[in-house]
């Protein structure tokens, strides 16, 4: 997410938004001020809590990118769209069904990302010479150490605290477009986090991108 002004934020809903900012070098941090943001436990979902949206770029391996003839392509970057299924990329949706043994019944090239995701297929569109993937991390205040149960004050921003987020690993590709749908914060985690909560002290959070 990006700061729109001092009082509220808005999602970076486009891959080509000009206000994506670069990450700090390893061992260094970038800082951003955000307002206090606390809520009751039932309201701890992705439209209310404060989070960070990360954009990554990648180039698929040619040997793992399958064309319409069932063979690996020479250069994945000549294609504007790729489909990802079961750890391989495909140049068309038809190739996903034919060579990836995916169930593509009812799907077309015009199907939405949500319709594709329902069958474990992810669409990636090239921009800026590479393909992009996105990750959301929702900032925790009090971790209950249970990834499936929402805790009281688990997600939120409380005044007089510094929240430090450190990305420690990336486990899997995220979606091909920014994920802005309403979800509970306690959902499948894209980031594994270790952090401490102390007043007026940096709250360290190590994050694994999944």
Identify the residue ranges that each predicted region occupies:
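C-terminal functional modules
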Residues: 154, 159, 175-210
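Short Gly/Pro-enriched loop/turn and capping motifs at secondary-structure junctions
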Residues: 172
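Tryptophan-paired
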Residues: 4-159, 209
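Short Pro-Gly-centered flexible turn/kink motifs
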Residues: 159-165
């Amino acid at each position: 997410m990006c700061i729109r002004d001092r009082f509220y934020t808005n999602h970076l809903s486009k891959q080509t938004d000009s206000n994506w900012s670069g990450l700090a070098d390893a061992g260094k941090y970038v800082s951003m001020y955000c307002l206090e943001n606390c809520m009751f436990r039932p309201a701890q979902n992705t439209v209310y809590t404060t989070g960070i949206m990360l954009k990554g770029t990648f180039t698929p391996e040619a040997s793992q990118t399958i064309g319409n003839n069932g063979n690996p392509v020479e250069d994945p970057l000549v294609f504007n769209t790729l489909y990802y299924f079961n750890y391989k990329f495909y140049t068309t949706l038809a190739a996903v069904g034919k060579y990836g043994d995916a169930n593509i019944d009812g799907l077309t090239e015009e199907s939405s990302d949500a319709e594709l995701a329902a069958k474990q297929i992810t669409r990636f569109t090239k921009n800026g010479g590479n393909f992009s993937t996105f990750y959301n991390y929702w900032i925790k205040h009090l971790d209950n150490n249970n990834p499936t149960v929402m805790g009281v004050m688990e997600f939120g921003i409380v005044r007089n605290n510094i929240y430090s987020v450190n990305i420690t690993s990336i486990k899997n590709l995220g979606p091909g477009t920014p994920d802005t749908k309403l979800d509970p914060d306690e959902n499948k985690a894209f980031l594994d986090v270790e952090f401490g909560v102390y007043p007026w002290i940096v709250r360290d959070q190590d994050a694994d991108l999944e």
